[in-house]
């Protein structure tokens, strides 16, 4: 193996009440892809923020291209040849793709004016490399979340960096977009670029990475080549124990029909009908753009319905806003927890109780003691790792933020809980905890809708599965009669009946 182009040795970083990094180390080699693995809260993102100068380090050393380095901030590290593609996109919806890619370093003519034709041409070349079909003159806001992620990647490529850090780069990508990204990674690897690949998707690690570094509780656990381990060994390194069963589904006797949807049509949704019983988990599968999230938002009241009937406990409802949906007993946990679900500048307590203040109030007075008791109960029940209920939620790991988002929905004591991509960006240990919580609510008779892009998750946790394509339901299966091939056939628009299956 070549000499490392980047070495982080025994890095330490502490925040009030938390030691985020405790002698964490990472080596990045030219022409190789290094997976950085660990549970949420293991210190992966903190280590990258120390590297790029967002956080100062308390101890340890950074060596880049054989020289000791300490970057003053992201611009400094970027100019030195280290780019980071964050899990949360740093883009402006109101600007064009090209303007986003070259923001702050626009291509100019000899007279100091922006050379628009040249800038669009360079941006179009980058988009072509990533197989993005849009013109760089397109406004970013017109793109899907997955396409916006590809623009973020194009922006990093424009720096011709020697080290590129990708933090959960495929979280919002379709299979086609993911394969395009992998082609670019292979191309960059051939050019001698060192890549740090942060992901919880074990399949991707074994497909695209050469080496693996594992962190746990801020500590360096080990480094190995991908060919030297397997999924079980990697999980054990990450969580410090064996996970016996990935999807711990339980069988519960279902009760009466709780939710009935008849001929529902709305934004991106066409003539959808289904039922949901008490104590049942209904999985919703489909490819990106199939209309799954839109369907949930119409049911919840976040998007308008044009026609159709929604019956909840034999009573027709017509939610016209999220507040209306909550008041009727429907809680929706968004796929975009940082955009729709949480207020990052508020505390754990404030976020968790935000939607339940009416239930925690007498008249206009919030019963703060009741609020504290309820929040503390959820922190304990969900095993949320936080120094206190007053901790700013933006400082928590992704897995713990997701647990708070789910608790926030449950604080309203809903009849129907809609979970949209509940384990996106969450590590294997936190996933298992979330699955166990879902089972607990199921056993208590709650009706749950589980929307997920991960087919094994839908198959593993659901009792019954609906598949969507272009806003319509193209398949319905009992989970025990379904498999990935049947779900994928329906997801691309092929009608598959359970009898034929």
From Swiss-Prot:
Disulfide bonds: none annotated. One of its GO terms (cellular component) is plasma membrane. Its main location: membrane. Its EC number is 7.5.2.7. One of its GO terms (molecular function) is ABC-type D-ribose transporter activity. It catalyses: D-ribose(out) + ATP + H2O = D-ribose(in) + ADP + phosphate + H(+). Residues 6-242, 253-495 form the ABC transporter domain. It is found in: Cell inner membrane. It is a peripheral membrane protein. InterPro entries: AAA+_ATPase, ABC_carbohydrate_import_ATPase, ABC_transporter-like_ATP-bd, ABC_transporter-like_CS, P-loop_NTPase. Pfam families: ABC_tran. Keywords: ATP-binding, Cell inner membrane, Cell membrane, Membrane, Nucleotide-binding, Repeat, Sugar transport, Translocase, Transport. It comes from the Bacteria. ATP binds at residues 38-45. Belongs to the ABC transporter superfamily. Ribose importer (TC 3.A.1.2.1) family. Part of the ABC transporter complex RbsABC involved in ribose import. Responsible for energy coupling to the transport system. PANTHER family: CARBOHYDRATE TRANSPORT ATP-BINDING PROTEIN MG119-RELATED (PTHR43790), D-ALLOSE IMPORT ATP-BINDING PROTEIN ALSA-RELATED (PTHR43790:SF3). The complex is composed of an ATP-binding protein (RbsA), two transmembrane proteins (RbsC) and a solute-binding protein (RbsB). This is Ribose import ATP-binding protein RbsA. It comes from Vibrio vulnificus (strain CMCP6).
């Amino acid at each position: 193996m070549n000499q490392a182009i980047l070495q982080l040795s025994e890095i330490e970083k502490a925040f009030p009440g938390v030691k985020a990094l405790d002698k964490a180390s990472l080596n990045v080699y030219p022409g190789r892809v290094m997976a950085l693995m660990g549970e949420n809260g293991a210190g992966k993102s903190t280590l990258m923020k120390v590297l790029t100068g967002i956080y100062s380090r308390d101890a340890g050393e950074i060596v880049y291209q054989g020289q000791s380095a300490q970057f003053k901030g992201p611009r400094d590290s970027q100019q030195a040849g280290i780019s980071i593609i964050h899990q949360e996109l740093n883009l402006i919806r109101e600007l064009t793709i090209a303007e986003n890619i070259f923001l702050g370093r626009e291509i100019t003519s000899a007279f100091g004016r922006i050379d628009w034709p040249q800038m669009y041409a360079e941006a179009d070349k980058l988009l072509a490399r990533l197989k993005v079909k849009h013109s760089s003159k397109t406004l970013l806001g017109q793109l899907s979340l997955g396409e916006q992620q590809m623009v973020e990647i194009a922006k990093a490529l424009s720096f011709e960096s020697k080290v590129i850090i990708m933090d959960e780069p495929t979280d919002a990508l379709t299979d086609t977009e993911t394969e395009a990204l992998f082609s670019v990674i292979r191309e960059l690897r051939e050019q001698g670029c060192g890549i740090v690949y942060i992901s919880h998707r074990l399949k991707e690690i074994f497909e695209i990475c050469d080496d693996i570094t594992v962190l746990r509780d801020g500590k360096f656990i080990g480094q190995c080549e991908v060919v030297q381990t397997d999924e079980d060994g990697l999980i054990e390194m990450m969580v410090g124990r064996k996970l016996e069963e990935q999807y711990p589904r339980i069988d519960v006797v279902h009760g009466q029909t709780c939710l009935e949807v008849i001929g529902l049509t709305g934004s991106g949704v066409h003539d959808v009908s289904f039922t949901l019983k008490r104590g049942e988990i209904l999985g919703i599968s489909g490819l990106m753009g199939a209309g799954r999230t839109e369907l949930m938002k119409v049911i919840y009241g976040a998007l308008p319905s044009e026609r159709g009937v929604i019956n909840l406990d034999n009573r027709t409802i017509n939610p016209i806003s999220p507040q209306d949906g909550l008041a009727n007993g429907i809680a929706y946990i968004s796929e975009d927890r940082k955009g729709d679900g949480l207020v990052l500048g508020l505390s754990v307590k404030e976020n968790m109780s935000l939607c339940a203040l009416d239930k925690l109030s007498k008249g206009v007075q919030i019963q703060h003691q009741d609020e504290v008791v309820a929040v503390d109960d959820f922190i304990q029940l969900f095993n949320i790792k936080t120094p206190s209920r007053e901790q700013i939620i933006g400082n928590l790991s992704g897995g713990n933020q997701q647990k708070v988002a789910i608790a926030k929905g449950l604080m309203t004591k809903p009849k129907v809980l809609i979970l949209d991509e509940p384990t996106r960006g969450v590590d294997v240990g936190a996933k298992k905890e979330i699955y166990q919580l879902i089972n607990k609510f199921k056993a208590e008779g709650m009706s749950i809708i589980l929307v997920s892009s991960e087919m094994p998750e839908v198959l593993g946790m659901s009792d019954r599965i609906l598949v969507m394509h272009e806003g319509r339901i193209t398949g319905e299966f009992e989970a025990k009669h379904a498999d990935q091939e049947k779900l994928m056939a329906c997801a691309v628009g092929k009608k598959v009946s359970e009898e034929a299956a």
